[in-house]
Amino acid sequence: MHKDVHVTAVDCDAAALELARENAKAHALDGDDDSDDALVSIRYADMLDDHSMALLGSFDLVVCNPPYIAADAWQDLDASVRDYESHGALVGSAPELDGLGYYRRLCWLYEQGLISLNESTLPASPGALGTSDLPCMVMEVGAGQAPTVRANFETARVQQAHGGDHYVTQCDVWHDSAGRERVVVVWRRGGGGHGGG
């Protein structure tokens, strides 16, 4: 891992956080008690709780694999998944049971600024990509969910920190090795309305 990269790993499950701490320590990425020299910080936050999300600080890039299995699809999962994976990690506890609740929540957090993204990654001129052409969010999605998630983010209205125009959010969909739509990638571009293409 590059010394200038700092990762904040976030989860709401105590067992997952403990395992992440063990992994960071095993790979000498943990520094000294979550100090500034740590390359990986492990933090608790619940995506459904505004306060815990607001305490996280700001990021250049958010990578997320939220629960996306619909509640009624749990029993139909292959036993190799259902019997060994956490129900909370796959289905979660979002009020909506269609598997899209966490994406709606992510989009709302993005619009409200509760997922705080660094201004330094934004382009100097409207319409240009930001520093290093980094997206601001990368999210794994379930089968058939990419079009809805993409549409939600492309119509998101995110106010620029200094006022003025809203950011323009543009999305792309990446496919896995089997050709399935697997990841929605979000870019935030400077000024000029909202929407995307």
Give, region by region, the residue ranges found by the protein language model.
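Flexible, glycine-/basic-rich loop-and-beta segments that form/coincide
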Residues: 190-197
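Mobile active-site "lid"/loop adjacent to the S-adenosyl-L-methionine
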Residues: 68-101, 121-124
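Acidic-residue sensor for enzyme active/binding pockets
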Residues: 1, 85, 140
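Short amphipathic alpha-helical segments
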Residues: 21-22, 74-78, 150-153
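Short phosphate-engaging motifs
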Residues: 16, 77, 145
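Conserved RecA-like P-loop NTPase ATPase core
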Residues: 65, 81, 106
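Conserved SAM/SAH cofactor-binding pocket of Class I
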Residues: 1-74
